[in-house]
């Protein structure tokens, strides 16, 4: 089969559960790390900045039996290649598209967070006949008003967007991973889990994608390129009958009250479920609740 050509087998972390396997999928001469379990209709888990497929491990293993589970490391993250490219959303999307095509995935259920939502929804809007359903939370979904974000984050993001200053803070001094990332949890991450997220980025060069994350985040209409990129999915969200599930968390971070209200009005065939306390990397904070809600939703839509 097409998906078995030129793939490098690896061993996944044990937290993905018994029977999981890992391999690299080639894309434009680079490698996209993938963890897989099971068979049947694919369920694809896409993370965001600065994490990896590891973020999904607790949910992934709790959904064994629902289909062919596939958790990806986006280009520039985790165990995937970290090329010296411009990490625009369009460039990153090319690798996401290539991964879907390399595995020839159809009848796909997408489970998305952070920039994973931006890429997954963009792909869905251009491949509607290949999409079965979409679940998402804490998404990069549309422009965010700075008044809805913490003043500390707005100030830090503005500094990271300054040429030179962002490179020093994120790439040279590694302070995004050591200072900012740990701040996004109600309960501190266990040291071993923090190491799992930090280890894939040992050098300044390897952290280029991480810097692009805050620089690409759309706040007060900037950058306009991100706003335009996200708009590509709006018509599909507004018109598609594809089942959609949005999970909410308190206090949350990217899913502001304004964006939640926009979603309620704009997104067709949308269910919304409250999933408890969490900031942004909610797969670490509410894995059991997320898995339970996804399990019930997947069972429900399978009967439709």
UniProtKB/Swiss-Prot annotation:
<feature type="active site" description="Nucleophile">
    <location>
        <position position="114"/>
    </location>
</feature>
<dbReference type="InterPro" id="IPR029058">
    <property type="entry name" value="AB_hydrolase_fold"/>
</dbReference>
<dbReference type="Pfam" id="PF00561">
    <property type="entry name" value="Abhydrolase_1"/>
</dbReference>
<dbReference type="InterPro" id="IPR000073">
    <property type="entry name" value="AB_hydrolase_1"/>
</dbReference>
<feature type="active site" description="Proton donor">
    <location>
        <position position="138"/>
    </location>
</feature>
<comment type="similarity">
    <text>Belongs to the haloalkane dehalogenase family. Type 2 subfamily.</text>
</comment>
<comment type="subunit">
    <text>Monomer.</text>
</comment>
<comment type="function">
    <text>Catalyzes hydrolytic cleavage of carbon-halogen bonds in halogenated aliphatic compounds, leading to the formation of the corresponding primary alcohols, halide ions and protons.</text>
</comment>
<keyword id="KW-0614">Plasmid</keyword>
<protein>
    <recommendedName>
        <fullName>Haloalkane dehalogenase</fullName>
        <ecNumber>3.8.1.5</ecNumber>
    </recommendedName>
</protein>
<dbReference type="InterPro" id="IPR023594">
    <property type="entry name" value="Haloalkane_dehalogenase_2"/>
</dbReference>
<feature type="active site" description="Proton acceptor">
    <location>
        <position position="280"/>
    </location>
</feature>
<keyword id="KW-0378">Hydrolase</keyword>
<feature type="domain" description="AB hydrolase-1">
    <location>
        <begin position="42"/>
        <end position="154"/>
    </location>
</feature>
<dbReference type="GO" id="GO:0018786">
    <property type="term" value="F:haloalkane dehalogenase activity"/>
</dbReference>
């Amino acid at each position: 089969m097409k998906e078995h050509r030129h793939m490098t087998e690896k061993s996944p972390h044990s937290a993905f559960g018994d029977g999981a396997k890992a391999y690299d999928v080639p894309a434009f001469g680079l490698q996209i790390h993938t963890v897989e379990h099971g068979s049947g209709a694919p369920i694809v888990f896409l993370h965001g900045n600065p994490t990896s497929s590891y973020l999904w491990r607790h949910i992934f293993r709790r959904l064994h039996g629902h289909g062919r589970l596939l958790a990806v490391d986006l280009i520039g993250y985790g165990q995937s290649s970290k090329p010296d490219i411009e990490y625009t959303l369009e460039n990153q999307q090319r690798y996401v598209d290539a991964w879907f095509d390399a595995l020839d995935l159809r009848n796909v259920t997408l489970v998305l967070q952070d920039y994973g939502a931006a890429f997954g929804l963009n792909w869905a809007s251009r491949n509607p006949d290949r999409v079965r359903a979409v679940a998402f939370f804490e998404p990069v979904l549309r422009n965010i008003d700075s008044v809805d974000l913490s003043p500390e984050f707005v100030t830090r993001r503005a500094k990271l967007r300054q040429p030179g200053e962002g490179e020093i803070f994120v790439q040279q001094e590694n302070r995004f991973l050591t200072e900012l990332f740990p701040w996004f949890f109600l309960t501190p991450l266990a040291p071993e889990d923090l190491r799992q997220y930090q280890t894939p980025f040992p050098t300044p060069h390897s952290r280029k994608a991480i810097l692009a994350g805050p620089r690409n985040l759309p706040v007060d209409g900037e950058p306009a390129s991100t706003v335009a990129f996200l708009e590509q999915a709006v018509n599909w969200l507004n018109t598609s009958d594809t089942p959609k599930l949005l999970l909410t968390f308190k206090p949350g971070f990217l899913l502001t009250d304004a964006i939640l209200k926009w979603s309620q009005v704009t997104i067709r065939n949308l269910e919304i479920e409250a999933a408890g306390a969490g900031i942004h990397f909610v797969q670490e904070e509410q894995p059991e609740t997320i898995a339970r809600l996804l399990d019930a939703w997947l069972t429900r839509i399978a009967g439709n």
